[in-house]
Regions:
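Basic, helix-initiating cap at the start of DNA-binding domains
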Residues: 1-20, 24-36, 49-53, 58-61
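Hydrophobic/aromatic residues within well-ordered alpha-helical segments
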Residues: 5, 48, 55, 59, ...
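Key DNA-contact positions within bacterial/archaeal DNA-binding proteins
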Residues: 39
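A short His-aromatic
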Residues: 42-45, 49
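Hydrophobic alpha-helical connector segments
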Residues: 54, 68-96, 145-149
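Amphipathic alpha-helical packing segments from all-alpha helical-bundle domains
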Residues: 61-64, 109-136, 143-147, 171
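C-terminal peripheral helix-coil segments that are non-catalytic and often amphipathic
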Residues: 87-90, 121-133, 152, 158-187
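Amphipathic alpha-helical segments used for helix-helix packing
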Residues: 91-111, 158
């Protein structure tokens, strides 16, 4: 019952935050839509900001699963790394990710938690280590390189999400990403 209540609040909040935005979402309307009380919201999440943090964490987890699946199904380590980077930028145009994670989440919650950043960096570092071991890219500290790549992808995703029309920025970012990634390849 407790998990069902939590899941219902998260699902209702995701819909409301995506369509209405965090600031315009009324907690009374949200809990009424979920068929629950404000007390249930406060019990599970503390407040509206806590609910947003839980929604962002849930979406981040789903993004990570999608990126891991892309890496796992790629033909080779280079395609895994490249596909993961490209997909991350493309996800910045998805309405739910764009509004909840990249716009409202950043504005209300601030930068991503250190734990979330470390998870992304560790995944990228593992891919980069495989590329170095396979002599596909030149040797460097994989964690330092992962931080640089993660930082550029994250900042580019915010830039894409903040655009009034995301298509030109996405295409520009993907083109720039290809240039950056080609620069990593061993000559």
């Amino acid at each position: 019952m407790i998990e069902a209540t939590r899941a219902k609040l998260l699902a209702t909040a995701r819909r409301a935050f995506q369509h209405t935005g965090y600031a315009a979402t009324s907690m009374d309307d949200l809990t009424a839509s979920a068929g629950l009380t404000r007390g249930a919201l406060y019990h599970h999440f503390g407040d509206k900001k806590g609910l947003l943090a839980a929604v962002v964490e849930q979406i981040d987890g789903e993004v990570d699963q999608r990126l891991n699946a892309i890496s796992a199904h790629a033909a080779d380590p280079w395609d895994a790394f490249r596909g993961r980077c490209r997909s991350y930028l493309q996800m910045a145009t998805e309405p739910e990710i764009r509004r909840i994670v990249l716009q409202d989440g950043r504005a209300v919650l601030g930068p991503a938690s250190e734990a979330a950043q470390q998870q992304c960096i560790a995944s990228l570092a593992a891919l980069l280590q495989r590329l170095m071991a396979g002599r596909i890219i030149d040797d460097a500290d994989p964690h330092a390189l992962a931080r640089l790549v993660n930082g550029s992808l994250t900042d580019s995703a915010f830039w894409i999400a903040d655009a009034p029309d995301d298509t030109p920025r996405l295409e520009q970012a993907l083109q720039a990403l290809e240039l950056l990634l080609r620069g990593l390849l061993r000559q």
